[in-house]
Amino acid sequence: MGEKVALQVWRGDAGQGRLTDYQVEANEGEVVLDLLHRLQATQAGDLAVRWNCKAGKCGSCSMEINGRPRLACMTRMSTFEPGEPITVTPLRTFPVIRDLVTDVSFNYAKARQIPSFTPDPSIGLGEFRMQQVDVQRSQEFRKCIECYLCQDVCHILRDQQKQDEFIGPRFMIFLANLDMHPLDTADRLRAIRDDFGSGYCNITKCCTDVCPEHINITDNGIIPLKERVVDRFYDPIARLLRGIGGGKKEPAPALDPDA
């Protein structure tokens, strides 16, 4: 038999809700998701929890545990002090559907706004060799499991509620991956500045801190994009050189997510 743990779980829907107290058994080696499953099985059969792989790879079980955005399947009970109460609440940035399940469809709409990868048609299959630095950079960005913890913790979305103006850190690294690809020909910098709100990010690195895949979102993704925007639109020397040499990429404005 394990020890009893004080578990506070947010119960409710979009209209109203509150924290409900439970005493749940916890065994050695378990994670918070194990306790939620035990709670469903023994005390709260109607508790709504989104989960899938229980291996930290699907991003489904995102929630806030003691106020910090985490994956429930990767948060071990051993990280808490003995007797410490555990509070589990839904992601605060997104609308609640029921209990711990939130509506993250905002992110899907944002993804549809991004112009897709546009390869150079003049380069045939197998004619270009990727450099290792480009491979490594892309591999880091592609580790994203779309848990949206970074979107949840971003204060531009969470506190200032700038969902219409700022695309969020998850999609800033998606844009960085496209913009830094050596074969991509689309010019998204104006859209990154005007439509996706790169200027709103003040690089507090809170998104990097909560990423379960340890992607260096701020330093390797957002800051390089912001630097490219500055070089393009605010550096007079770079502007002069571009005027002499001409642009290599075709402008790619943001897309209509409802189209």
Feature map (PLM): residue ranges:
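Active-site phosphate-binding and catalytic loops of NTP-dependent enzymes
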Residues: 44-50
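DNA-contacting interfaces and partner/effector-binding or oligomerization modules
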Residues: 50, 60-64
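Ferredoxin-type iron-sulfur electron-transfer modules in oxidoreductases and energy-metabolism complexes
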Residues: 30-42, 89-259
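A generic structural motif
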Residues: 76-77
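Short, contiguous acidic and Ser/Thr-rich linear segments
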Residues: 19-31
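Eukaryote-biased recognition of intrinsically disordered, low-complexity regulatory segments
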Residues: 2-22
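Short strand-turn-strand beta-turns centered on an Asx-Gly dipeptide
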Residues: 10, 64-67
